[in-house]
């Protein structure tokens, strides 16, 4: 007993000392970071431990599988089609209704319309390749084969959801130019096919072929394209990525590197416009210059304005001079320690006056200034600063810019939007904090209401990306939809978290370019374009219906009535609460109907839109 008792006391003393140290650390963290942050850290750690056994999720197919035909078995592979809103897994076999494969798309002038084709290997095959022919109509008009973009989907091991912690899976993510690849037995290779209808293309149905080949085996899949003989209207609101950093280092670079940076920025601007976006938000450089007369020069903004005008964006350019004003929130509060009101406020005024006039002189649609990144109440400048210090900065900068004649914007919550005090024109409200009541709050404040929903572009959903860049903002009367950020920026390009589980990139250089020297898109980026086109169809229908009705012709009025009823039905099918729309199980990514919407509803409404425009175009004159 004499030996045991001291040992027990020693253990108690050690345990007490450990607990004391832990308590001291916890107290220090609470004082340094705040109780809310510490509680969140503890909760995340608990989730990691609890979810350790459920980290990797395998998606299971739904629907009855289609047995391979004798020809498929002899060939060694089957070819099938699937909606672009439904993922093709790396081992998915064709389901009933997906074979025999046939592709059919509908598009207006200068529209890009996508379809999805996949190959399931019953046995190992080498040199699996895809090719497309030109398309012709009954009168001999042709859409060249070069207008059919063929890309292979690449599989990545990635986090499945921003809502459910610690869930990972293997999903198709990027779209690289298609090259011959091998396919092991039991695996599947999906392909993304985008048809671009040239301006002025004769209306009608065009026929062509997409061929899948492996060695001496081949399958020819019919490709039909219905062309609408008109161009879609531009989307009627601000649509585009936020905080694009492509010119951030431009002012610090030497001549050769600066030229390269500007070229890469041009690639980004072109791709964003090509995807139907109406604007973008540029994240500023860190330094400014003065000309010989002392006038303000922002080289990054000068380049951006030139590119913006070249690409003919139809809405104002957003510029966030947060690096110049020391108001960005990277590194949390660190940058605000350099904020100097005596410097930032006059600079904010000067940016507004100088570059507002320059935008007008260049014939741009306008310039919107966003002087500070989301001044939420959870973060102050330092642990000893007043919690509203960032809000006071926002108030004084917005006032300075507005007094100088600027149009202003700010990423915000419904609460922090109030710091604008009448000087905030565009509320860019975070999706997580967006509620139906925000519409009325913005109206009372006399502000334009927009949302930023980052998961639309940098998440891993499908229908979510399309819905929130299309039907939802149009039906709710929103005036802008944005997201952080362009998903192909080199630092944000998708990362394959487990090369043993997924293949990742095949041929990507400079961090975001494919073998064709074009940006390698993500599936979400392509689906956002589909959403923009949904909106453009609706806007064009509304305009042509009004014109048809004003003509007084009985047939035109009937067509206008049908169009108006369709538009009303779309609005009635959408509710203002964005959080009702979870199109997938967040734990497994299995698709599910979201408040009356699934992939079949998207496709049915697009078909109706196309048919209505074809009918209305007869009365367009």
What is each residue range found by the language model?
Residues 120, 156-176, 180, 187, ...:
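Aromatic-lined carbohydrate-binding surfaces of glycoside hydrolases
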Residues 5-22:
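N-terminal Sec-pathway targeting helices
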Residues 348, 352-386, 396-415, 494-621:
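Catalytic domains of carbohydrate-active enzymes that cleave complex glycans
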Residues 40-99, 122-193, 201-202:
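Surface-exposed binding patches on compact interaction domains or structured appendages
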Residues 425-503:
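Catalytic-core region of carbohydrate-active enzymes that cleave or remodel glycosidic bonds
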Residues 25-45:
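Membrane-interface motif at the C-terminal end of an N-terminal transmembrane signal
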Residues 100-123:
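Contiguous beta-strand segments within globular domains
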Residues 107-112, 184-188, 203, 348:
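Solvent-exposed, conformationally flexible loop/turn segments
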């Amino acid at each position: 007993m004499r030996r045991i008792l001291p040992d027990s006391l020693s253990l108690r003393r050690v345990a007490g000392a450990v607990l004391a140290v832990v308590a001291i650390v916890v107290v220090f963290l609470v004082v340094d970071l705040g109780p809310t942050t510490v509680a969140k850290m503890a909760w995340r750690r608990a989730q990691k431990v609890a979810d350790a056994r459920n980290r990797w999720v395998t998606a299971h197919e739904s629907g009855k599988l289609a047995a391979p035909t004798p020809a498929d078995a002899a060939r060694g592979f089957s070819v099938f089609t699937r909606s672009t809103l439904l993922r093709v897994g790396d081992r998915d076999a064709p389901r009933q209704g997906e074979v025999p494969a046939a592709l059919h798309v509908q598009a207006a002038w200068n529209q890009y319309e996508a379809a999805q084709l996949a190959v399931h290997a019953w046995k190992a095959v080498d040199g699996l390749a895809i090719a497309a022919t030109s398309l012709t109509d009954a009168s001999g008009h042709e859409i060249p084969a070069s207008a059919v973009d063929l890309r292979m989907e690449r599989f990545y091991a990635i986090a499945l959801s921003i809502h459910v912690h610690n869930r990972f899976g293997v999903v198709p993510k990027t779209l690289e130019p298609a090259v011959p690849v091998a396919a092991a037995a039991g695996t599947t290779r999906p392909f993304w096919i985008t048809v671009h209808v040239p301006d002025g293309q004769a209306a009608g149905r065009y026929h062509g072929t997409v061929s899948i080949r492996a060695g001496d085996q081949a399958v020819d899949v019919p490709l039909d394209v219905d062309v609408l003989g008109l161009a879609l209207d531009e989307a009627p609101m601000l649509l585009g990525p936020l905080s694009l950093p492509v010119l951030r280092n431009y002012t610090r670079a030497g001549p050769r590197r600066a030229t390269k940076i500007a070229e890469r920025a041009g690639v980004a601007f072109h791709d964003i416009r090509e995807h139907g976006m109406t604007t973008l938000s540029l994240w500023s450089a860190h330094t400014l210059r003065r000309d010989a007369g002392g006038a303000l020069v922002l080289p990054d903004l000068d380049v951006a304005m030139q590119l913006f005008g070249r690409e003919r964006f139809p809405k104002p350019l957003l510029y966030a001079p947060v690096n110049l004003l020391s108001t960005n929130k990277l590194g949390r509060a660190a940058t605000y320690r350099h904020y100097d009101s005596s410097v930032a406020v006059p600079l904010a005024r000067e940016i507004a006056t100088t570059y507002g006039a320059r935008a007008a002189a260049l014939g741009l649609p306008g310039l919107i200034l966003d002087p500070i990144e989301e001044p939420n109440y959870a973060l102050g400048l330092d642990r000893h600063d007043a919690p509203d210090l960032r809000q006071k900065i926002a108030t004084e900068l917005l006032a300075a810019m507005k007094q100088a004649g600027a149009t202003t914007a700010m990423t915000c919550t419904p609460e922090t939007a109030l710091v604008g005090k009448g000087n905030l024109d565009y509320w860019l409200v975070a999706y997580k904090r967006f509620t139906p009541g925000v519409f009325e709050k913005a109206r009372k404040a006399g502000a334009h209401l927009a949302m930023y929903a980052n998961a639309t572009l940098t998440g891993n959903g499908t229908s979510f990306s399309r819905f929130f860049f299309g039907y939802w903002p149009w039906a709710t009367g929103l005036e802008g939809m944005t997201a952080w950020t362009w998903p192909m920026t080199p630092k944000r390009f998708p990362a394959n978290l487990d090369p043993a589980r997924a293949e990742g990139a095949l041929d990507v250089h400079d961090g975001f370019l494919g073998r064709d020297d074009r940006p390698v898109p993500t599936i979400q980026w392509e689906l956002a374009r589909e959403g923009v086109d949904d909106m453009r169809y609706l806007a064009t229908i509304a305009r042509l219906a009004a014109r048809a009705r004003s003509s007084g012709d009985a047939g035109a009025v009937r067509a206008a009535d049908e169009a108006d009823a369709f538009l009303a039905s779309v609005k009635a099918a959408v509710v203002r609460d964005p959080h009702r729309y979870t199109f997938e199980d967040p734990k497994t990514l299995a698709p599910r109907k979201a408040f009356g919407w699934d992939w079949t509803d998207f496709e049915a409404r697009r078909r109706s839109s196309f048919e209505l425009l074809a009918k209305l175009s007869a009365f367009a004159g």
